[in-house]
A protein has these predicted regions:
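C-terminal accessory/binding modules appended to enzymatic or scaffolding proteins
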Residues: 123-171
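Aromatic-anchored, charged helix-turn/loop surface patch used as a conserved interaction hotspot
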Residues: 93-142
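Catalytic adenosine-cofactor/nucleotide-binding cores of aminoacyl-tRNA synthetases and other
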Residues: 1-104, 175-203
Length: 203
């Protein structure tokens, strides 16, 4: 039987193969020549403007059914560059339901749903203050994924909140779960105004 657990790795291999064909990554000449011969047979048309969303990130996008939010997240994360043709945007986002099905069928680390309304949560005063502080930092700096990941650690320490508990608070707020994907990159991809409101427990 075909094991779909590592399907994301197979898709990553195809994406790299495509990038080699289009000269987007370095590769030995023999690999480039082989890719150039084979590639036209595995796509409907050779279109250099085509955009691919990493399969695991497509699974993250699948945590919401809001198609506009999916596109916003893909753009904010850099998976859809500025100037991408509309057909290429639609083509890239077609990968999302496939990745969502993969996450659900394998019940892997991406099998979560974005809580689109504020879950019923209660935090102690220190955690609530830390969440509000993190909201202020995001509102002021709009950090990228790694900077936000570090800000989460730093904010927890600044307020004397256990780091693990602070991450759990974040997952409860945004996924209504106790765990989930890397929180910084996940929040960085969301609309910052939405993230700020949720961290302030406003909706």
């Amino acid at each position: 039987d075909f094991d779909i657990t590592t399907l994301d790795q197979l898709v990553d291999e195809f994406d790299r193969f495509e990038q080699v064909t289009l000269g987007e990554v370095e590769a030995p000449e023999t690999e480039r020549e082989r890719a150039a011969r084979v590639y036209p047979f595995v796509v409907d048309a050779v279109r250099p403007e085509r955009v691919r969303i990493a399969y695991t990130f497509a699974a993250v996008l699948g945590m919401t059914d809001d198609t506009d939010l999916r596109e916003t997240m893909a753009r904010r994360s850099g998976h859809i560059p500025e100037g991408t043709p509309e057909w290429a945007v639609a083509d890239a986002l077609d990968r999302v339901p496939l990745a969502r099905n993969w996450a659900v069928r394998t019940d892997n680390a991406y099998n979560y749903r974005l809580a689109e309304t504020l879950p019923a949560v209660e935090f102690d005063d220190d955690t609530t203050a830390a969440l509000a502080d993190l909201a202020d930092r995001i509102e002021a700096d709009d950090p990228d994924d790694e900077a936000l990941q570090e800000a989460i650690y730093g904010t927890a320490r600044d307020h004397g909140v256990d780091v693990g508990d602070f991450f759990t608070a974040g997952y409860r707020l945004f996924l209504d779960e106790d765990q989930g994907p890397r929180l910084g990159p996940f929040l960085a991809a969301l609309d910052s105004a939405f993230v700020v409101r949720r961290l302030r427990l406003e909706g």
